[in-house]
Amino acid sequence: MKRLLRISFDLSLLSFIPIISWFLLGIIIDKNLINIFTLTYPLQFIYYIFKSIFSTGANINKEKDGNNDATMSGLVIGSILSTLVFGIILFNIDDYISFMNMDISIYKTFAIYSILELYISLEFSFILNKLYYEEKNVLANKYSIIFNLLNFILLIATSLITKNQTVIVIATIIPLFIFTLILIIKNSDKFKLKLDILKCIKYDSVELFNNIAFLLIFLFGLSNALEYGDKYALALTFISLITDTQWDTFDAIVTSATID
């Protein structure tokens, strides 16, 4: 129960702080920016797909099959593949925003921030999950609090100093990336590249296929819904903001059960 509470705290924190951030950015910079949450909402399921295979699956592969190289192998392979996928999305950011029926000129800069933040959060989650499976829950929660507060403080403080969106994004993303990189290096183990990807898929197959389904549902569903304009987008955003934290907290039950 104690571990469940710690994990639920971590997952709800990961969801709650970005929600507050988008609210404040909407007040400080541009009221439309809160809709970035909905614009990039489908992409979080790419995050969960990678996490399912290369973090959860890899950690279970280590525990069940005695493959001590699985966790670090999953981190490295997952990082390489996720860099390629998120890089492709960023390279085609204009097409993505257009597909979602939103204004490129309004949303592009902070859409880039949102995608980069999601990518860095994925890399961070690889290490966080590793610590949970090693039962270093207190340390994992400490890192989680620092990561989220760092993201929040940098983003909001910079937006209060300047309204230049590019400067805000750079000033937030670079320190966040450096912090995550330091944690990965600090908590990495020596390993040989060895991972049974098919077993990793099998061990967390239910969550994996759920996330693939949700990716397709939200990608095409929100694309159609956002055709109705900014007011409808705002309504969808508020619904997502309310439910997202609850979903992440409930996900702690799955995470805790999987670890056990």
Predicted regions and their residues:
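Cytoplasmic helix-loop-helix junction between adjacent transmembrane helices
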Residues: D103, L118-S144
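Short membrane-interface helical motifs at transmembrane helix boundaries
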Residues: G26, T83-K108
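Alpha-helical transmembrane segments and their helix-entry boundary regions
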Residues: I7, I34, N129, N137-S144, ...
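Small-residue-rich hydrophobic transmembrane alpha-helices
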Residues: W22, I34-T83, L128-Y133, A233-D260
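Helix-terminus/linker motif at the lipid-water interface of multi-pass membrane proteins
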Residues: F16-N35, I97-N101, A157-T162, L215-T245, ...
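Signature of the first transmembrane helix
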Residues: M1-S55, S205-E227
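Hydrophobic alpha-helical transmembrane segments
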Residues: I112, K142-A157, I161-S188
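Residue-level recognition of transmembrane alpha-helices
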Residues: L11, T38-Y41, G78-S79, A111-S114, ...
